[in-house]
Design a protein with these regions (language model features):
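Conserved catalytic or regulatory cores that recognize and/or transform ribose-phosphate-containing ligands
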Residues: 1-152
């Protein structure tokens, strides 16, 4: 039996709307599933956050939204994934959590696919450029690279 193919779907959450955090991830999960690739969303099982207009640090007392809950599961997901897809499109402020996930993915030797504008993204930085094995300008291109990584 072939090992399940996992890709972690990283990107800004703090300061975004619930749908802003989930819509692109749900799309990616649906598209990757067509190729038997499982997308791991840090927003899974967090429907309780829908009631909030914007997601900000400390917004919920739910165990999955606690400091430990977020960090523990996200690190575990990055560690067990085979690749990471970072969607930084349209970011309005630096996503500290996503930058930490870049560090984890690097430490765990995961291939990086970064989806980011060619110019003007607030995350534009030498280390992000260096860590990004693949950099594309839209989500569909990013998903195509992920599929290519798993084409064996």
């Amino acid at each position: 039996m072939q090992k399940e193919k996992l890709v972690y779907l990283a990107g800004p959450i703090d300061g975004c709307t619930y749908s802003g955090c989930t819509d692109w991830r749900e799309y990616a999960i649906k598209e990757l599933k067509k190729d038997n690739i499982t997308g791991l969303s840090p927003m899974r099982a967090k429907e309780f956050l829908k009631e909030h207009p914007k997601l900000v640090d400390g917004i919920s007392k739910h165990v999955l939204a606690s400091d430990a809950g977020i960090t523990t599961r996200d690190m575990w997901d990055v560690r067990r994934s085979d690749a990471t897809l970072f969607n930084l499109l349209g970011a309005e402020k630096v996503s500290i959590g996503t930058m930490i996930e870049y560090g984890w993915a690097s430490a765990f030797n995961k291939p990086f696919v970064t989806v980011m504008e060619k110019q003007g993204n607030i995350h534009e930085h030498a280390m992000i450029r260096r860590l990004s094995g693949y950099r594309v300008e839209n989500l569909d291109e990013g998903l195509a690279v992920v599929r290519a990584l798993f084409a064996y």
